[in-house]
A protein has these predicted regions:
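Short glycine-rich, Thr/Ser-proximal phosphate-binding strand/loop in the N-terminal lobe
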Residues: 2, 11-57, 228
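Glycine-rich beta-strand-to-loop/alpha-helix junction loops that act as flexible
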Residues: 8, 89-92, 208, 322, ...
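Phosphate/pyrophosphate-binding loops at sites that engage ATP/ADP/AMP, CoA/4′-phosphopantetheine
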Residues: 69-84, 190-197, 312-323
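Short beta-strand-loop/turn "lid" adjacent to the catalytic site in phosphate-handling enzymes
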Residues: 70, 74-122, 143, 149-158
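Glycine-rich phosphate-binding loop of actin/hexokinase-like ATP-binding domains
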Residues: 150-255
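Catalytic phosphate/nucleotide-handling subdomain of diverse soluble enzymes
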Residues: 218, 224-256, 265, 329-360
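Adenine-nucleotide phosphate-binding core of ATP-dependent small-molecule kinases
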Residues: 265, 272-276, 283-318
């Protein structure tokens, strides 16, 4: 059995897999670590949700709480912690050092720590998760699966920024991209689903959730992606601006008297759908506001879909054509309107959506293009945890 952990700055999500059947036998998450009112929310085997409140000052206490819950006589899923063969971690930023999943040891963790500058919120939290497991279960192998790894196949002309080269040499400033585990999972899964060989396929994967990114994939390898050095580049997101003129950033800093922390906060947490609409960062709430005729919400929605559409066109050019356009992520999987609006007007590229099929699809694997459509448009729900568990298993076998 494999335990998958995703440690954020104030949260830990977990899933326990039985790898013989690939089934999730326990799952849940801890929220508000280090804050008042921290709790663990778990899904019982019968699908019932349960909330356990507990003071969780830091990640080690959280991991311990999760492990104790897994063997709890009432809500547990296993009899003893010995049943866990390994732990797989979602690691956010692996820099240029990691292009595939690895067994975590001292040397690997030192190299990962060296990437902290690149993801100051996420990487230290990921490390806390690893250290917490080491403290409680010192003999269990742990595997790191990096969000940036899949994108390491991008060519240099796609990942370099047009800035003085020494900034790349000194600080590693370049495009890295994120959601890599999701893009890798869905691009592989869509080929299985359609019964095609990944070699020879040109695929554009759209991971649209609260954060959003698109990847251009050729022969199963990533050639380009919308997020950059940080997850702030590319699409318009729930609270992130996505692409913005760097000159506008310095202009705003000057006018508003903002320092780097202030401007980072503005662009990461107060912009995007929330900033434009003034309503919410949640697309469901935005939808409701649009239906109520709120002009700012309508503008935000138009901008949101337009950006996605524009990148699909750009990546079709970068790939020299496209065979499959894929939607995943919370919004991509569940909101048919988003898929419809993004694909509207792309008939010239051979993209034709079957509206009656599209309207019915919420979180299921499905082809939503018409039989006549030259490009297959497909919805594939992402399963990053399953891929992390599979990678962990593969590394264990080695």
């Amino acid at each position: 059995k494999i335990l998958v952990l995703n440690c954020g700055s104030s949260s830990i999500k977990y899933k326990l897999f039985d790898m013989t059947s690939k089934e999730v036998i326990a799952q849940g998450g801890i929220e508000k670590i280090g804050l008042k009112g921290s709790f663990l929310k778990l899904t019982l085997p019968n699908g019932e949700k349960k909330i356990l409140e507990k003071d969780i000052p830091e990640h080690t206490v959280g991991v311990e709480f999760i492990l104790n819950t897994l063997i709890h006589p009432e809500y547990g899923a296993i009899k003893s912690l010995d049943e866990i063969n390994a732990v797989g971690h979602r690691m956010v930023h692996g820099g240029e050092r990691f292009s595939e999943s690895v067994l975590l040891n001292k040397e690997v963790l030192e190299a990962f720590t060296a990437c902290n500058d690149l993801a100051p919120l996420h990487n230290p939290a990921n490390l806390k998760g690893v250290n917490a497991v080491s403290a409680i279960l010192p003999n269990i192998p742990q595997v790191g699966v990096f969000d940036t790894a899949f994108h390491q196949t991008m060519p240099d002309y796609a990942y370099m920024y047009a800035i003085p080269h020494e900034l790349y040499e000194k600080y590693g400033v370049r495009r890295y991209g994120f959601h890599g585990t999701s893009h890798r999972y869905v691009s592989k899964r869509v080929c299985e689903f359609l019964g095609v060989n990944p070699v020879g396929q040109k695929i554009i994967t759209c991971h649209i959730g609260n954060g959003g990114s698109i990847a251009a994939i050729k022969d199963g390898k990533c050639m380009d992606t919308t997020m950059g050095l940080t997850p702030l580049e590319g699409l318009m997101m729930g609270t992130r601006s996505g692409d913005i003129d760097a000159g506008a950033v310095t202009f705003i800093m000057e006018k508003e008297g903002l320092n780097t922390t202030g401007v980072s906060n503005l662009l990461n947490k107060k912009s995007g759908v929330l900033g434009v609409s003034g309503v919410s960062s949640d697309m469901r709430e935005l939808d409701a506001a649009c239906k109520a005729g709120n002009p700012k919400a309508i503008l935000a929605e138009k901008m949101y879909y337009y950006r996605i559409k524009k990148y699909i066109g750009a990546y079709a050019a970068a790939l020299g054509g496209v065979d499959i356009v894929l939607f995943t992520g919370g919004v991509g999987e569940n909101q048919s309107l988003c898929r419809e609006e993004v694909c509207k007007g792309l008939e010239f590229m051979g993209i034709e959506i079957d509206k009656s099929v599209n309207d019915k699809i919420h979180g299921d694997e499905a082809v939503i293009s018409t039989p006549a459509s030259k490009v297959k448009v497909v919805v594939i729900p992402t399963d990053e945890e399953l891929l992390i568990a599979s990678d962990t298993m593969d590394i264990l076998k080695k």
